[in-house]
Amino acid sequence: MDLITKLMVKPDSEDFPLSEFGLSESPAAEAVRAVFPNTALDPLEAQAALAFLLLKYRVSVSITMGPSFDFVYDDSQQFLADNSVINPPLAFDSSHQGHRSGQAVVWNRIYRVIDGLAALLQAEDFGDGTSMWDRTMIYVASDFGREKKRPSGANDWGTGHSVNNGVQVFSPLVPGDTLLGGVDGNTGLTYGFDPTTGAPDTGRTMSEPEIFSGLLGALGVDTSGSGLPDMPAMRRS
């Protein structure tokens, strides 16, 4: 089977005549469309669909994806009708000036896509009695944090950049339903955790090498000789 066919989500149709070019939809396309039905309009769903197929057919072992900055809406409905916005804007006005409301909308999209990917990967046999999801890690992070100051009484407000941040990891390879570290309720800033036990440590700030090493350890990568610290709290025992 050629690579184009393996990765083809769209079905053969009059508007998209694959058969005229000797092509066909992927054998997994129907299952993918059932989970991500809006790939034609939703750039995040389209990325997720392609990500699954790249993993399924062993074309790639690592995928980077994220919401588009573009404002996308379903123009088949009345202009900006309820639920017609497919991809909310993430450019300056939304990410800086309306950060809180923008985050609220985009988190829902990210979680839905993660849930869909997990479902598809769980149904995919790795070949040894385990599923592809059993060997997958989804790492959610931004390129920077946001300042934590809220103007008195404000429901929405502008934010500047901050080096203080947190990440989320979804995987059977890490301890589930677990918060490592925490957030100081007085400052909104994060604090760290004990690398061995995972116990919160309000006086500790985690370093990049520690988090990086913890992710590699959860994936089973041997970091001996690298100088990276051991982070057993970040991997499932």
Regions found by a protein language model. Name each.
Residues M1-D128:
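Anion-binding catalytic surfaces of enzymes that hydrolyze or transfer phosphate/sulfate esters
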Residues V72-Y73, Q77-S237:
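Feature marks hydrolase-like catalytic cores characterized by long aromatic- and Gly/Pro-rich stretches
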